[in-house]
Amino acid sequence: FKRNKDIHFDIYYKIVNISRDTIFYSKCKVPDTTDGRLEILLLHLIILIRKLKRDRKEYLSQSIVDLMFSSIDLSFREEGVGDLSIPKKMKKVGMVFYGRSASLEDILDTEDELNKKSLLIDYFLRNAFSSDTSYKKNAEELSKYAIAFVGLVENISISEISRLDIQAIK
């Protein structure tokens, strides 16, 4: 018997597992580094949190964000980052998260689909590929995926999120 308030764990770890899918690092060529993995995790979390806010589930979205920060903090500690360096690193992660959130939500709220796709390509080039234009095709793949993932997430209930399957949109 699972308590309803524990759903944020199920949702967060489902998103973590989706973000580890090799498609992002092989087909889309996102660097398989800490920063690259963080970009893909944030992509999924921001889209999910956007849905939760629209569904008026702010408490659940905040619980997921809190869990993400706790998980990243723990990862730093497990990597041997010193206690004095953790706050500075976490501040940077927070700035990245809230900056990406604002940017990505603005892009996803764009009504013109061609403009949205173009903005997403620029977003991914800048953030996932360090503005290296030789990755434009990969940024295009990520933008198509992001739009498909938004469609997938928007059309399911909260209870279905922990069973999300991205196979159909890869």
Label every model-predicted segment.
Residues 1-170:
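Surface/interface-facing alpha-helical segments and adjacent flexible terminal/loop regions used
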